[in-house]
């Protein structure tokens, strides 16, 4: 079966990746090895699925919402011993493979209208991370989102999302993906990124994560203001000054200038202050 008669549906945010070089880069970035079990989100017409099945991976489990595409995927790949398919919304259906065990890695062409919720589902939140984490996620996302995820302190794109994602895993750029690489072409630039989630022992504890979230919400709500002003409610000025210095933070800085580890250090100091009170 071919998909030539199936047109992209706007309500599903469908833009099919057709550039072979980018498809190859995605598979290369996943670094698939013998035994790897892969979750593919949004297989579409199967261009990436075909490459994943040809890789060393042991199993490819695809999740597709569009019923018409499900029929074509099942006809094209249903007899392949490494392939399984689940029809449904990736935000709500179980993501485990047929044996009930989770995948090792994720490859996803994320519809731009569900990027935030899907990141929560695949990686989790700072205070509620996915556990156990996937070994690696290779994600095709809107360029602006990719910039915010991997931005470094001091950059205009550095945000609360940057801090959260970089405390949950190692985020890196794979390749740019211009609109011409899709059918139909989207109106925005895209990018492939790679995220290697940290194991639990390298992530902030639940208590620290809650403290960091509290600080991020306060600080980035008024990102143009200095921390001396935005963080004033957390404790007395003298205590805030002392804790900031211990964390390597200047209260004259703005939130986008503070590194993720420094936010953790400040949250730790505040937690200790609260415990001693």
Which positions does each model-derived feature cover?
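Catalytic cores of RNA-modifying enzymes
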Residues: 1-217, 242-245, 256, 265-277
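Short, well-ordered alpha-helical segments
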Residues: 239
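Active-site-proximal catalytic alpha-helix in oxidoreductases
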Residues: 221
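Short helix-coil junctions and helix-kink-helix linkers
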Residues: 232-233
